[in-house]
C-alpha cells in the first residue's frame, strides 16, 4: 500500500471462502452474510490491529486504519468496520479518541445496494460499468452504496470497464493519504 504510505497491511478473503452455488449456499453468497462475516472478524482482530498501530514516544497512537476492498470484499469490509467500531467502543474514552479509521475505498463492490456507508468515515466507491462488457464482467457490480454522495462514487464507463482489481490502478493512484473530516457538506482532508 505504498500509495497510502502504509506498510503494515493485512489481507482478508472478503468472499468468506468463495461462492460455490453448486455445492453450498453459505453466508458468503449474500451481501448481508458477508457483512456479518466481516463484523465477526473485525471484532475478533480489533485488539491485535489496534495494539500494532504505530505510536509516538508518549505511546499515543499516530497511525490510522484504512480499509480497501474489492468485489465481494466490499460488504465484508463494511462489516469489518462495524466490528472494529464495536470493539473500540469498549475501550477507555481517551484511547477511543486516538483510534481513527480514516478511509474506506470500495472497488467494484458486489452487492453494493445492500451496503450502507459509515457516515463517520470517508468512503469512496469506484465502479467500472459497461453492461456490454460480458467477458470482462463490466455488468457485475454497478449498484451504488447507500449513504454516499455522487462525488464519492466514481464510475468509469470508458477506458476500462473490467471487474478485475488490476483494472483499477488509475483509481488507486487517486487515493490520498491523510485524515478526513466531515464539514457538514463534504469530506475535507486535514
Pin down the residues of each PLM region:
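Active-site catalytic motif of lipid deacylating hydrolases and related acyltransferases
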Residues: 1-62
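Sequence-level detector for tyrosine residue identity
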Residues: 7, 11-12, 19, 76, ...
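C-terminal catalytic-base region of ester-bond hydrolases, centering on the histidine
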Residues: 18-32, 116-190
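Serine-dependent carboxylesterase/thioesterase catalytic core
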Residues: 36-144, 189
Amino acid at each position: 500500500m505504498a500509495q497510502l504510505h502504509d506498510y503494515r497491511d493485512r489481507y482478508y478473503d472478503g468472499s468468506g471462502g468463495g461462492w460455490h452455488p453448486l455445492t453450498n449456499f453459505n453466508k458468503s453468497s449474500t451481501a448481508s452474510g458477508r457483512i456479518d462475516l466481516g463484523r465477526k472478524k473485525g471484532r475478533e482482530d480489533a485488539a491485535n490491529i489496534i495494539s500494532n498501530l504505530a505510536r509516538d514516544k508518549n505511546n499515543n497512537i499516530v497511525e490510522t486504519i484504512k480499509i480497501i476492498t474489492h468485489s465481494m470484499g466490499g460488504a465484508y469490509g463494511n462489516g469489518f468496520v462495524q466490528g472494529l467500531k464495536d470493539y473500540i467502543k469498549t475501550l477507555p474514552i481517551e484511547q477511543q479518541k486516538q483510534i481513527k479509521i480514516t478511509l474506506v475505498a470500495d472497488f467494484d463492490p458486489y452487492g453494493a445496494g445492500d451496503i450502507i456507508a459509515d457516515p463517520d468515515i470517508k468512503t469512496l466507491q469506484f465502479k467500472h460499468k459497461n453492461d456490454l462488457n460480458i467477458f470482462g464482467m463490466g455488468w457485475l457490480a454497478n449498484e451504488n452504496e447507500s449513504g454516499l454522495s455522487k462525488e464519492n462514487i466514481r464510475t468509469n464507463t470508458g477506458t476500462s470497464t473490467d471487474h478485475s482489481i488490476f483494472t483499477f490502478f488509475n483509481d488507486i493512484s487517486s487515493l490520498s493519504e491523510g485524515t478526513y473530516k466531515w464539514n457538514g457538506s463534504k469530506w475535507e482532508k486535514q
